[in-house]
């Protein structure tokens, strides 16, 4: 990490922002800044102060009028000297500034390299590093709040406490291997109780993964049904937009229409599909095929029926095609009269009446979706956190090792066997926080970060 790295730290989007940031980190960051930035007046670079001036090109001409922020090591995110140029947001300006930094010896940063340096320099642990990426990619306020809990070190504190308990017991057992004659008899009941508490603790941490996965990856919901039952009206009412075209003509929707919604913090991708019937032309046939594909790929299917017509044979046919997925039946046009609605007694998670044009039943529909996920009271409080897939896998290995410890104790095997599995549990827990992690794992984790973070 002896070289100085640089990257654009702000998002590059088609709609150019008003401000762009180019970030440097490394021992030569300040020296480079002094070569390219002309401070206004008699200012001198001071740590943690914003300075105004001009960024210069190779000929001494002005590239941009901007601000510069210098953060002296170790009081920076990476614990190295860090310099940020806050310039105008046009991509041409930002790229010229970045190119000039490279010309003077800085290296383009790899994805996540700033955060990697923060980890390697002891500024943050691995759970906090991963929380940085989760905060950047959060798609709802609840997901962001969950990431902040991890960034604050809540998860790391829990795992370190758990690992410390394993190491304390391991130290005691290894001492007995060396000085057994000098110590009182070992209370195996206390050992089992100790391991039992550690197992319960690990399982509590593992239980947070479901909520975290929902907030990170979201849910895909397909709206299916016969033509003209109100699928597009339901999407428009739910999204509070005119996302889909609505007419009285059956078969208006010919393709899958997507909309992103937020259901109590859970990102939900809703797919409004073409009405399923015998196709009358090639275009409609392709649309219906895509409807079937959307239903197969969905996490949850909303089967919409028409209250004025009741449950029809065509509805039964569609249900038979989608019943392998979790299904909620939506009885639309419930404000109108119609025959009694008899839905299948098996294979349906819930039946929800709606009147899409006036928005009735949307709250009940969202409640049914949350209930289907086992999340009837979904909320994220300050300080909450959730383990990600990598952390969960490491906790599973710790759990397996701890279960083996209990089994070896109960089988009255020699203490040597206990220590093998205790050491494995401690190692797995160390992988969560980064205290025992390989370079390959680090590379895999940080390669998923955006460049400049």
Curated annotation (Swiss-Prot):
Keywords: Cytoplasm, GTP-binding, Hydrolase, Magnesium, Metal-binding, Nucleotide-binding, Potassium, tRNA processing. It is found in: Cytoplasm. Its EC number is 3.6.-.-. (6S)-5-formyl-5,6,7,8-tetrahydrofolate binds at residues 23, 84, 123, 453. One of its GO terms (cellular component) is cytosol. Its cofactor is K(+). Belongs to the TRAFAC class TrmE-Era-EngA-EngB-Septin-like GTPase superfamily. TrmE GTPase family. This is tRNA modification GTPase MnmE. It comes from Gloeobacter violaceus (strain ATCC 29082 / PCC 7421).
